[in-house]
């Protein structure tokens, strides 16, 4: 493959972010002072870069940006806080704590993310410390939920295979704990831990990460086939559980996935993780740590858009990666084992698991937990949390599973579901049940177009077409992203939209239904009228001409609307 297709390994001197990390004294910077500075609701850019490692981003309300500029006021600064919640598992007490904190310090809503955790928006600087202390008091934290480190570790919340799921979740939790930064900066700044006198050697402070941490974010997921609801091929490292006779024997190891790109730069692209071998369960920690150190040592620290692990691998090759990994491990991965994914969506409604426990998967449109005039979703879930004795399991599709419900509690929980009309999605189209959107406007500073606030109304219009075509109950994965950074993993959708400008999107078709294939751009920079005009004949053709069991993404490739994308390096071809 031609060299010019690949991002360079390094591109000159280290970026400014590398300087900020190096000078930060292990993520302290001047954050403590900036948070106490009373003249601005914001913080300096250097500290904002460090704030990500603590689980937060400085944002502003973009709906108010122009008006405040006219009034010569600073932007309406506020913070987003993201919780570290390995595998998306929260207790009822933790759910109630997040609900309370969202009303006390946030905008009164919670956002379930595509990485199985909570986000809170609208927190003012003066409330940040109290808010993070409240999260920690509920036995959660926000460490490494953002930043150039390993982020929230995902895990399949599969109610059908609860015993194996429990084992896999334990590994996800162990990975999350083991790969945390070791600096005490978080505890000093937010939890008032006293700083220990003396300066330890850098390898004592961060034995794995070092003082510069990683070149960019790093994401790990663990999946249990046949469910790929964590989109395992989108992860920097994906561990695919291999079951033999119902027992966990180990994990296939996939490397180098990632969804982000930059419009107009063909050296950036979404990429799928590639399987490099198999490890036994007790080897998973060693494999993850050694892969992270490879990215630490070889990732691009000059240009951040070229810094993800996928580019490190694509530049040097899979054989190089395997050789480097085996050298660091001192042993070799085994041959990959066979497995099969059949979907990357959630399975809604009631299911019965082991030990007589029940699980209820509810549809949460775009992950937004809030009360509106006609749908008291937040209140309903709060009432469930008050009586529930199991867990809340957040899914990678922004939904929630009320899990491990005892037979004695099932009737009471179903009564709350009926009282508040909480939905398992059966009364909405299959397209909507398989939809996902990132936050975008008004809080995300990177958004180029609407996403969460727009996709539901676009689906309203697409549902008219689906009804006419007779395919309302046909599962089709549709996702929207407000920018090309890929938080909603739109490049894996059968129908994907990636924002380019207000009201304008690139339309992508042909992603794999089980998250195993990237999509391909079909039309560029189009608005709603052209979106509907474009999709209508394709959806009608699918209704009439599809083969039995054929998914929409496979159909558009077979009929020649787009070519199959075998690798991210061909995404722009």
UniProtKB/Swiss-Prot annotation:
GO cellular component: sulfite reductase complex (NADPH)
Gene Ontology molecular function: 4 iron, 4 sulfur cluster binding; heme binding; metal ion binding; NADP binding; sulfite reductase (ferredoxin) activity; sulfite reductase (NADPH) activity
Catalytic activity, EC: 1.8.1.2
Binding site for [4Fe-4S] cluster: 438, 444, 483, 487
Source taxon at top rank: Bacteria
Record's cofactor remark: Binds 1 siroheme per subunit. Binds 1 [4Fe-4S] cluster per subunit.
Reaction catalyzed: hydrogen sulfide + 3 NADP(+) + 3 H2O = sulfite + 3 NADPH + 4 H(+)
Pathway field: Sulfur metabolism; hydrogen sulfide biosynthesis; hydrogen sulfide from sulfite (NADPH route): step 1/1
GO biological process per UniProt: cysteine biosynthetic process; hydrogen sulfide biosynthetic process; sulfate assimilation
Residue ranges of the TM segments: none
Cofactor(s) listed: siroheme; [4Fe-4S] cluster
Gene3D superfamilies: Sulfite Reductase Hemoprotein, domain 1
Cited InterPro entries: CysI, NiRdtase/SiRdtase_haem-b_fer, Nit/Sulf_reduc_fer-like_dom_sf, NO2/SO3_Rdtase_4Fe4S_dom, NO2/SO3_Rdtase_4Fe4S_prot, NO2/SO3_Rdtase_4Fe4S_sf, NO2/SO3_Rdtase_FeS/sirohaem_BS
Residues at which siroheme binds: 487
Keywords, comma-separated and alphabetical: 4Fe-4S, Amino-acid biosynthesis, Cysteine biosynthesis, Heme, Iron, Iron-sulfur, Metal-binding, NADP, Oxidoreductase
Family, as annotated: Belongs to the nitrite and sulfite reductase 4Fe-4S domain family.
Its job: Component of the sulfite reductase complex that catalyzes the 6-electron reduction of sulfite to sulfide. This is one of several activities required for the biosynthesis of L-cysteine from sulfate.
Assembly description: Alpha(8)-beta(8). The alpha component is a flavoprotein, the beta component is a hemoprotein.
Listed HAMAP family: CysI
Protein name: Sulfite reductase [NADPH] hemoprotein beta-component
Naturally occurring in which organism (per UniProt): Shouchella clausii (strain KSM-K16) (Alkalihalobacillus clausii)
UniProt lineage: Bacteria, Bacillati, Bacillota, Bacilli, Bacillales
């Amino acid at each position: 493959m031609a060299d010019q297709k690949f991002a360079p390994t390094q591109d000159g001197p280290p970026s400014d972010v590398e300087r900020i990390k190096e000078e930060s004294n292990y993520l302290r910077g001047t954050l403590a002072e900036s948070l106490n500075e009373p003249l601005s609701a914001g913080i300096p850019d250097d500290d904002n870069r460090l704030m990500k490692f603590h689980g937060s981003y400085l944002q502003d309300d973009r709906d108010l940006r122009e008006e405040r500029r006219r009034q010569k006021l600073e932007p309406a600064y506020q913070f987003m806080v993201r919780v570290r919640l390995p595998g998306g598992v929260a207790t009822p007490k933790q759910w109630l704590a997040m609900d309370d904190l969202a009303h006390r310090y946030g905008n009164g809503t919670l956002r379930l993310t595509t990485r199985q955790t909570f986000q809170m928006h609208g927190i003012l600087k003066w409330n940040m410390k109290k808010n993070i202390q409240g999260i920690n008091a509920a036995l959660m934290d926000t460490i490494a939920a953002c930043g150039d480190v390993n982020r929230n570790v995902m895990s399949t919340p599969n109610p059908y295979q609860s015993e194996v799921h429990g084992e896999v979740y334990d590994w996800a939790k162990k990975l999350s704990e083991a790969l945390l930064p070791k600096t005490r900066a978080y505890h000093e700044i937010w939890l008032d831990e006293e700083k220990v006198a003396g300066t330890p050697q850098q390898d004592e402070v961060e034995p794995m990460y070092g003082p510069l941490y990683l070149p960019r974010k790093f994401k790990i997921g663990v999946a249990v086939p046949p469910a790929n609801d964590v989109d395992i091929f989108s992860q920097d490292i994906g561990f695919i559980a291999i079951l033999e006779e119902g027992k966990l024997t180990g994990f296939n190891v996939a490397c180098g996935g990632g969804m982000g790109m930059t419009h107009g730069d063909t050296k950036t692209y979404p990429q799928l993780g590639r399987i490099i071998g198999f490890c036994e369960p007790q080897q998973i920690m060693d494999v993850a740590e050694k892969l992270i150190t490879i990215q630490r040592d070889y990732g691009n620290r000059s240009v951040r858009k070229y810094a993800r692990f996928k580019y490190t691998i694509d530049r040097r090759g899979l054989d190089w990666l395997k050789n480097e990994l085996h050298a660091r491990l001192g042993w070799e991965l085994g041959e990959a084992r066979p497995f099969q994914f059949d979907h990357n969506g959630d399975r809604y409604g009631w299911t019965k698991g082991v030990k007589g426990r029940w699980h209820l998967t509810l549809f949460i449109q775009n992950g937004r937990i809030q009360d509106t005039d006609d749908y008291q979703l937040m209140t309903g879930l709060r009432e469930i949390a008050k009586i529930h004795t199991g867990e809340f399991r957040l899914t990678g599709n922004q939904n929630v599973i009320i899990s491990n419900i005892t037979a004695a509690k099932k009737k009471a929980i179903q009564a709350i579901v009926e009282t508040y009309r909480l939905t398992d999605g059966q009364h909405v189209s299959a397209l909507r049940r398989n939809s996902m959107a990132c936050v975008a406007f008004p809080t995300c500073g990177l958004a180029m177009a609407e996403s969460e606030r727009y996709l539901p109304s676009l689906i309203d219009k697409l549902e008219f077409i689906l009804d006419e075509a007779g395919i309302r109950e046909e599962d089709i994965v549709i996702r929207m992203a407000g920018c090309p950074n890929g938080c909603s993993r739109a490049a894996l959708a059968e129908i994907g939209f990636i924002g380019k400008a207000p009201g304008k999107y690139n339309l992508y078709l042909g992603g794999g239904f089980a998250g195993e294939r990237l999509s391909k751009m079909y039309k560029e920079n189009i608005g709603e009228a052209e979106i509907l005009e474009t999709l209508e004949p394709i959806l009608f053709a699918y209704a009439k001409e599809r083969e039995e069991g054929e998914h929409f993404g496979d159909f558009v490739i077979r009929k020649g609307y787009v070519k199959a994308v075998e690798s991210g390096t061909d995404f722009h071809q």
